[in-house]
Curated annotation (Swiss-Prot):
Encoding gene per record: ABCB6
Residues modified by glycosylation: N6
Effect of R69G: In a breast cancer sample; somatic mutation
Species per Swiss-Prot/TrEMBL record: Homo sapiens
EC category name: translocase
Name under which the protein is recorded: ATP-binding cassette sub-family B member 6
Length: 842
């Protein structure tokens, strides 16, 4: 019968870590299994939200072999199963070869922890395979990798088996194979080495997550691909593709193109390393002071130690490095780096938005796009700050603390710190993930409550009409009560989190303090060591109090960053072809040849449109609304690319030249002129931003608006207001004409430029437009036919086709569509003239 003896082979503590030319087996098989178990638990915690959110209906419709590769995955599954079973086999081997000798307790603990860690790895492998099959079933495929947690778990296992080789010459290990027990343990080590090495290599390859060589066919009756993709995108875990997100983020950490800021980054990282050293040195000097006071050391030694301690404390700050000189210096230096990163991201997004097509902008709400851009910029700088200067330093402090206590105190202290910190982080992440749903529900209800109040106040008159004040107050009260109920859950869960953290801190401090006090009474440690332990532990725990906040903020920032990167992934619809050259403008001959075009709905807006505008001529486009007249102008300006056919200017296909050169030769006067919230002078100067004040005034005089501008108290420096609301419709049109005059293009496009004006303003604007269009190729989209009677050619567009073409007189003589439109408009104008006196008489 096998009995269980002391924790280690020899009576005493786990340490020292190194003895008899090798690592202590007791120390090694306590630290490694505990580390692997903590990593496995943490990986499971991070995987659970992902598992919970990614379980859509119909995700299991694939057969076992229809997903990613199965043959290498079976091998990976077998190795993971062996990794979970081998520790128990090793324990059985120990029991079978013990020959009545007591079995050290650490072997039992190591076997259980190693098996549980292996089981965590096995479960994660199965879950990730299942998630890969789900995404494939939903028609989504990206570059798959195992999660960082699983890879780290397998890496640590393989590294631990290699670490055992440093004890090759130690008689405590099984390398000599002197008896049956050592031979069995050596054989099991070889098997573990092969298994862990195989899992490490296969983990990097991830065969169970890679696609088959054939193409998967998804039956339409079984899968709604479009809805599945939307659902998956909305429900996927924040931590999915964590490594890819970190790589994207790391690109903004290093300020490319600025050697000075790169040096600042290196200095900041060096200061961060100095803070880690200070967090170790401050408790050590505090311990030395206590020991010197206990030993009644000379005043000189005590004064020097106290002075050094206070100086280090000044550098460190209030115990956590958050307000010390080093931290403040790092924060000060980082301001420029943060501004550089923010500026770079903002300009990247803004430039990309201007490269996207008109089709994309018409389908998006500008406020939503700008909100994504703002949040994305803040998320990049916030993530860099949280990860680089909060999370990573905190984890580094924990690792340094574990190593320090294991080496200079006892391995038990390192184990206590490790277990407490692991439990602390795990519980923080679990509870934070759990309470996220309360926070989300509270935010949703807060928006609903605010919307209820806004809606009631906006409809103030309606509330008064129906004497519904008490009803509205009651509805608002119910919304507040519902919000406060959710707020209570969120606040209560935060209290639970804080109390859980406090409990873990207390248990860890109690265990370590009792052990430290015991060693002090045994005269293995000094009184100062007890003080050092308590100071160091509290110092480690203080930044961890904010770890839940960091975790939640990192989640939020990752979501915002994903939205920003999704925005940056939007393809530019209209692109310059590789090698495209500038437009060689000559006289302005425009040709449309068999042009077909359709918007996103698939319905053809233009069908086989062909026409030619000779240099200096005016072409008018008329027809009912929605016929495709404005679309022709947008195609010529290349807001869209045509489906088929060809558009040429001076014999050059406009799709073969750069967009900038094309648009530099075209001036547009739209129906609704939108002005920038700037001065009148700057709005006119927008036609050519390098123009001087004299040129701006000359353009305004040519457009007939100079006198109106000078009538304003501030003249050309008058602010036009948002979207030019301080100016009348006629004044805004004249500003647009002045812009076009200043641009001096070779081609003019008039998109119903006077249709929104009254008759007197229209006639005045027409006179200004005639000056602008003189000797320039002009295309006019007209609603009032009387404005285009002098056009060199008139095209009648109906349902995307040219149904008639010719001059005004010729079209009237045909008695077709144009003649009917003319008669209808003439009748409407006569009716309008007849009713004016009657209206005046009333």
């Amino acid at each position: 019968m096998v009995t269980v003896g002391n924790y280690c082979e020899a009576e005493g503590p786990v340490g020292p870590a190194w003895m008899q030319d090798g690592l202590s087996p007791c120390f090694f098989f306590t630290l490694v299994p505990s580390t692997r178990m903590a990593l496995g638990t943490l990986a499971l915690v991070l995987a659970l939200p992902c598992r919970r959110r990614e379980r859509p209906a119909g995700a299991d419709s694939l057969s076992w072999g229809a997903g990613p590769r199965i043959s290498p995955y079976v091998l990976q599954l077998l190795l993971a199963t062996l990794q979970a079973a081998l520790p128990l086999a090793g324990l059985a081997g120990r029991v079978g070869t013990a020959r009545g000798a007591p079995l050290p307790s650490y072997l039992l603990l190591a076997s259980v922890l190693e098996s549980l860690a292996g089981a965590c790895g096995l479960w994660l492998l199965v879950v990730e395979r299942s998630q890969a099959r789900q995404r494939l079933a939903m028609g989504i495929w990206i570059k798959f990798r195992h999660s960082p947690g699983l890879l780290l778990l397998w890496t640590v296992a393989f590294a631990a088996e290699n670490l055992a080789l440093v004890s090759w010459n130690s008689p405590q290990w099984w390398w000599a194979r002197a008896d049956l027990g050592q031979q069995v343990q050596f054989s099991l080590w070889v098997l573990r080495y092969v298994v862990s090495g195989g899992l490490f290599v296969l983990g990097l390859w991830a065969p169970g997550l890679r696609p088959q060589s054939y193409t998967l066919q998804v039956h339409e009756e079984d899968q709604d691909v479009e809805r599945s993709q939307v659902r998956s995108a909305a429900q996927q875990s924040t931590w999915r593709d964590f490594g890819r997100k970190l790589r994207l983020l790391s690109g903004y950490l290093w300020p490319r193109g600025s050697p000075a800021l790169q040096l600042v980054v290196l200095i900041c990282l060096g200061l961060m390393g100095l803070e880690r050293a200070l967090n170790v040195l401050v408790p050590i000097f505090y311990r030395n002071i206590v020991n010197l006071l206990t030993e009644k050391a000379p005043w000189n030694s005590l004064a020097w130690t106290v002075t050094s301690y206070v100086f280090l404390k000044f550098l460190q700050g209030g115990g956590t490095g958050s307000t010390g000189f080093v931290s403040n210096l790092r924060t000060f230096l980082w301001i420029r780096v943060q501004q550089f990163t923010s500026r770079r991201v903002e300009l990247l997004i803004f430039s990309h938005l201007h490269e996207l097509s008109l089709r994309w902008h018409l389908g998006r709400r500008t406020g939503e796009v700008l909100r994504i851009a703002d949040r994305g910029t803040s998320s990049v700088t916030g993530l860099l700050s949280y990860l680089v200067f909060n999370v990573i330093p905190t984890l580094a402090d924990i690792i340094i603390g574990i190593i320090y206590f294991s080496m200079f105190f006892n391995a038990w202290f390192g184990l206590i710190v490790f277990l407490c910190m692991s439990l602390y982080l795990t519980l923080t992440i679990v509870v934070t993930e759990w309470r996220t749903k309360f926070r989300r529900a509270m935010n949703t209800q807060e928006n609903a409550t605010r919307a209820r109040a806004v809606d009631s106040l906006l409809n103030f008159e309606t509330v008064k009409y129906y004497n519904a004040e008490s009803y509205e107050v009651e509805r608002y009260r119910e919304a507040i009560i519902k919000y406060q109920g959710l707020e209570w859950k969120s606040s209560a869960s935060l209290v639970l989190l804080n109390q859980t953290q406090n409990l873990v801190i207390g248990l860890g401090l109690l265990a370590g303090s009792l052990l430290c006090a015991y060693f002090v009474t045994e005269q293995k440690l000094q009184v100062g060591d007890y003080v050092l332990f308590g100071t160091y532990i509290i110092q480690l725990y203080m930044p961890l109090n904010w770890f839940g906040t960091y975790y939640r903020m990192i989640q939020t920032n990752f979501i915002d960053m994903e939205n920003m990167f999704d925005l940056l992934k939007e393809e530019t619809e209209v692109k310059d072809l590789p090698g495209a050259g500038p437009l060689r403008f000559q006289k302005g001959r425009i040709e449309f040849e068999n042009v077909h075009f359709s918007y996103a709905d698939g319905r053809e807006t233009l069908q086989d449109v062909s026409f030619t505008v000779m240099p200096g001529q005016t072409l008018a486009l008329v027809g009912p609304s929605g016929a495709g007249k404005s679309t022709i102008l947008r195609l010529l300006f290349r807001f869209y690319d045509i489906s088929s056919g060809c558009i040429r200017i001076d014999g050059q296909d406009i799709s073969q030249v750069t967009q900038a050169s094309l648009r530099s030769h075209i001036g547009v006067v739209p129906q609704d002129t939108v002005l920038f919230n700037d001065t009148i002078a700057d709005n006119i100067r927008y036609g050519r931003v390098t123009a001087g004040n004299d040129e701006v005034e000359a353009a305004a005089q040519a457009a007939g608006i100079h006198d109106a501008i000078m009538a304003f108290p501030e003249g050309y420096r008058t602010q036009v207001g948002e979207r030019g609301l301080k100016l009348s419709g006629g004044e805004k049109q004249r500003v647009a004409i002045a812009r076009t005059i200043l641009k001096a293009p070779g081609i003019i496009l008039l998109d119903e430029a006077t249709s929104a004006l009254d008759t007197s303003n229209e006639r005045a604007i027409q006179a200004s437009l005639a000056k602008v269009c003189a000797n320039r190729t002009t295309i006019v989209v007209a609603h009032r036919l009387s404005t285009v009677v002098n056009a060199d050619q008139i095209l009648v567009i109906k349902d995307g086709c040219i149904v008639e073409r010719g001059r005004h007189e010729a079209l009237l003589s045909r008695g077709g569509v144009y003649a009917d439109m003319w008669q209808l408009q003439q009748g409407q104008e006569e009716t309008s003239e007849d009713t004016k006196p009657q209206t005046m008489e009333r």
